């Protein structure tokens, strides 16, 4: 399917249209939320200033008997409905701003900084499915 209607837009656009970037970001955040809850981590969503700097969220695990201090990971949240996999089929190839990549890979950062990419179906109608048997598939 080349074009699809998304409830927040009045017209159909190609699924790769930039208008869907906000929807993709919110879906990646929504996907990470129950994962953090399951492992007992706190998910802190950052405000626009940090988001513009490349940090969308911070995941923290509290101290426990094996870890005396909290474990903190900064996260850049992304999503794509047109993933590119390398020739070996092992790695996702994902374009990002050079400046953000340099910040993420800097040795001067205070904690690990991960890129979290949610791979969505190509068909927008399959991004979120709600039916009487399941809340969200």
Residue ranges and their predicted role:
Residues 1-53, 59-137:
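Mixed-charge (Asp/Glu-Lys/Arg
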